[in-house]
From Swiss-Prot:
SUPFAM superfamilies: Aspartate/ornithine carbamoyltransferase. Gene3D superfamilies: Aspartate/ornithine carbamoyltransferase (3.40.50.1370). It comes from Sinorhizobium medicae (strain WSM419). Its EC number is 2.1.3.2. The lineage of its organism: Bacteria, Pseudomonadati, Pseudomonadota, Alphaproteobacteria, Hyphomicrobiales. Catalyzes the condensation of carbamoyl phosphate and aspartate to form carbamoyl aspartate and inorganic phosphate, the committed step in the de novo pyrimidine nucleotide biosynthesis pathway. L-aspartate binds at K87, R170, R224. The gene is pyrB. This is Aspartate carbamoyltransferase catalytic subunit.
Amino acid sequence: MITFPHRHLLGIKGLTEQDITLLLDRADEAVKISRQREKKTSSLRGLTQINLFFEASTRTQSSFELAGKRLGADVMNMSVGNSSVKKGETLIDTAMTLNAMHPDVLVVRHSSAGAASLLAQKVSCSVVNAGDGQHEHPTQALLDALTIRRAKGKLSRIIVAICGDVLHSRVARSNILLLNQMGARVRVVAPATLLPAGIAEMGAEVYHSMAEGLKDADVVMMLRLQRERMAGSFVPSVREYFHYYGLDAEKLKAAKDDALVMHPGPMNRGVEIASEIADGPQSVIEQQVEMGVAVRMAVMETLLLSQNQGPRV
């Protein structure tokens, strides 16, 4: 019996330490399934999952699709480029049309913050936020946490340095919320132009120097420089950005010798991270991809099979 008090996964905000631990523990079990020769189960047989992606995302959409299929669900990927959205249909109209088909879960990625929450108010099925604007990306934070926990054995009392384009990063926001909830010490390292207002109030220590921000860090999480979201000149040049904030062997020396190197992908090699580091022995970037499928399996199972009879919001 699964007991989970939420009908949707719209963000890390609102999840308790117990909620997060339950999802991570179930994801650990999903890792075992994914490593078996026979990877498919029947736990979600007869249930329908629709992936509705308004932003291109090869790895996240593929991960959600694989997660659903490994659990035995019927999975439909809706291509927005070929849909009625291109003909002027609104987000709500599209959601209501899909809702009329009686899916069990709707996985949504959208460029507008709050899009997933809006849909959750309109549809009768569960909604999973696969990224909404610069707001949140909860499954990414969960897979990052799972990667760290499996490597370090814990999340509490570790130092995690999140470096780069924090301003435009929903990944950073979700990770800060989750890591604080689980008792980690979180730092953000970035130029002032790439930090959002109020970042310290979210529970992150702010640094503008990689040498200081990475000192004794257990985990170094690099963020992609999101040039497609930038309307102004946030950095003088890519070359200068890498000089000061790109992770190379010299900068990594400030962290602990066994520090993990992470990146949510896709990477800009030579911009936020050097290839020698991305492909080096401390990198767990490939493990993050593997954990992504496991976490999304855990989320789908937990939301759809929860036997909790209390209020589910």
